[in-house]
Amino acid sequence: MIEYLSLKKVTDMHRQETDDAVLRVVNSGWYLQGEATKRFEHDFAQYIGTQYCVGCGNGYDALWLIFRAYKELGVMSDGDEVIVPANTFIASILGISDNGLTPVLVEPLLDTLEIVDSKIDEAIPD
């Protein structure tokens, strides 16, 4: 087998720091919405140069929230279409459809698995 990425090596590089962080959270009894979450949200917001950050439990939650926010802000409305690669994970589709939006699947390139501008243009209705 050809090793692609040894996650064990990557993890071992940060073993003590990771173990200490996990132990702090476990000992605090706050697994969600505690000080560690607040600190992460603050630090990550600063890192990416924005004022706010909301930690999410998974990608679906994050996608659901952003599409809901777009609807609340009037950027999107029920039935609006969202173009996604046909090989996307189901959470992408559910985050869209669970907000009353319509996913539009576009076939990706075989060599990169990405969609290209011309395919996006074809998927946009006139």
Regions found by a protein language model. Give the residues of each.
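N-terminal "arm"/small-domain region of PLP-dependent enzymes with the aminotransferase-like
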Residues: 1-30, 35
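Phosphate-binding glycine-rich loop
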Residues: 30, 35-81, 95-99, 105
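PLP-dependent aminotransferase-like
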Residues: 71-126
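Small/polar loops that bind or transfer phosphate-bearing groups
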Residues: 6, 55, 84
